[in-house]
Amino acid sequence: MDSRPTIAEVDLAALRHNYDLVVRTIPRGCGILAVVKADAYGHGFMDIARELETLGVTAFGVAFLAEGIQLRKSGIDRPVLILGGVYPGQERKCVGFNLSTALFSLEQARVLDDAAGRLYRRARVHAKIDTGMGRLGIPHEEASAFFSALRELKHLDLEGIISHFASADELDEDGRRYSDLQASRFAAAVAAARHEGFEPRYVHIANSAAAFGMDLPFCNLVRPGIVLYGALPSGDFEGKMALKPIMRLRSSIAMLKWVEPGTSISYARRFTAPDRRLVASIPVGYADGYSRSLTNRGEVVVRGRRAPVVGTVCMDWIMADVTHVSGVTVGDEVTLLGCDQEGNCVRAEELAEWAGTIPYEIFCGISKRVPRVYLNPSIRHR
């Protein structure tokens, strides 16, 4: 074997558990658009998508055209929505690969309409309404005029209407008030579309947080992302979701050494042993996605015990203080993210807090040089 012992295990049984939790939470008859953009948040979107397809997922959400084409070329035939829309010159491929796209301007709509007409097809679009995110979308105040103009474009199929919450993961009074405001603006935009004679198949604004925390009776689709991969949308949801982490980043100890008091560890000598310590060298580093900001902050699990990361995180290595770990030896398994076989875990939420970021970035940061190994695929998936 030519590779290191550093791998990312992805437990598809845990994915199924999290998906079922979403199914049990949302209203009966509500569809699920699984967000698999950014390589399924670093988990490997081809294997994740195939597993979700066997579970009956309604649709998939990707960030841009190339991701949608990859799904189609792999045999995925469920609806695929390009959440970030298409760029000039991509319209024909979007239509040709039978992909749906978010639409956030009338100019974009006209170009898509022209491309679809030239192919003797209809482009499937989801009109994106900016209800307060301030990123992409038709301003909610202009929704009525937009839908009125859209009626003139005969090669577009308004398959859906979409918006995005800015703070659904904030459950304090201010966060809830703003989410309610966005929901009311979105409901008004949907009503404007129906007033112009449109009957969109999908109406959706709920991300992971809103799917679990809000009542949106006028919507019929939710867009879970982070919860499928086993992490909370925010700390406000602590204890509210029985999620299972689906990724385990693991490695093993390559070297053990006793160091004397005053010995410094790693670049810039940011850790100095206060007394005699046993230090383990582990072949994983920031090139693998183990952030340099975890220097002297991170913790790993060895033989069921937490061990602190000591010294600067290197490109290919970290060091951990295992003085207190009884029986530790070279070759022992190290869990950097996720849970070991006995259920001792380092949660993505913890890593994110130590690194000053969010679980999304932790997952997406696990680099391509870390092999993904998929465990417990469904029988149909095999």
Curated annotation (Swiss-Prot):
<dbReference type="GO" id="GO:0005829">
    <property type="term" value="C:cytosol"/>
</dbReference>
<dbReference type="InterPro" id="IPR011079">
    <property type="entry name" value="Ala_racemase_C"/>
</dbReference>
<dbReference type="GO" id="GO:0030632">
    <property type="term" value="P:D-alanine biosynthetic process"/>
</dbReference>
<feature type="active site" description="Proton acceptor; specific for L-alanine">
    <location>
        <position position="267"/>
    </location>
</feature>
<dbReference type="InterPro" id="IPR029066">
    <property type="entry name" value="PLP-binding_barrel"/>
</dbReference>
<dbReference type="Pfam" id="PF01168">
    <property type="entry name" value="Ala_racemase_N"/>
</dbReference>
<feature type="binding site">
    <location>
        <position position="135"/>
    </location>
    <ligand>
        <name>substrate</name>
    </ligand>
</feature>
<feature type="binding site">
    <location>
        <position position="315"/>
    </location>
    <ligand>
        <name>substrate</name>
    </ligand>
</feature>
<dbReference type="GO" id="GO:0008784">
    <property type="term" value="F:alanine racemase activity"/>
</dbReference>
<feature type="modified residue" description="N6-(pyridoxal phosphate)lysine">
    <location>
        <position position="37"/>
    </location>
</feature>
<keyword id="KW-0663">Pyridoxal phosphate</keyword>
<comment type="pathway">
    <text>Amino-acid biosynthesis; D-alanine biosynthesis; D-alanine from L-alanine: step 1/1.</text>
</comment>
<dbReference type="InterPro" id="IPR000821">
    <property type="entry name" value="Ala_racemase"/>
</dbReference>
<dbReference type="InterPro" id="IPR020622">
    <property type="entry name" value="Ala_racemase_pyridoxalP-BS"/>
</dbReference>
<comment type="function">
    <text>Catalyzes the interconversion of L-alanine and D-alanine. May also act on other amino acids.</text>
</comment>
<dbReference type="InterPro" id="IPR009006">
    <property type="entry name" value="Ala_racemase/Decarboxylase_C"/>
</dbReference>
<comment type="similarity">
    <text>Belongs to the alanine racemase family.</text>
</comment>
<dbReference type="Pfam" id="PF00842">
    <property type="entry name" value="Ala_racemase_C"/>
</dbReference>
<dbReference type="GO" id="GO:0030170">
    <property type="term" value="F:pyridoxal phosphate binding"/>
</dbReference>
<dbReference type="InterPro" id="IPR001608">
    <property type="entry name" value="Ala_racemase_N"/>
</dbReference>
<feature type="active site" description="Proton acceptor; specific for D-alanine">
    <location>
        <position position="37"/>
    </location>
</feature>
<protein>
    <recommendedName>
        <fullName>Alanine racemase</fullName>
        <ecNumber>5.1.1.1</ecNumber>
    </recommendedName>
</protein>
<keyword id="KW-0413">Isomerase</keyword>
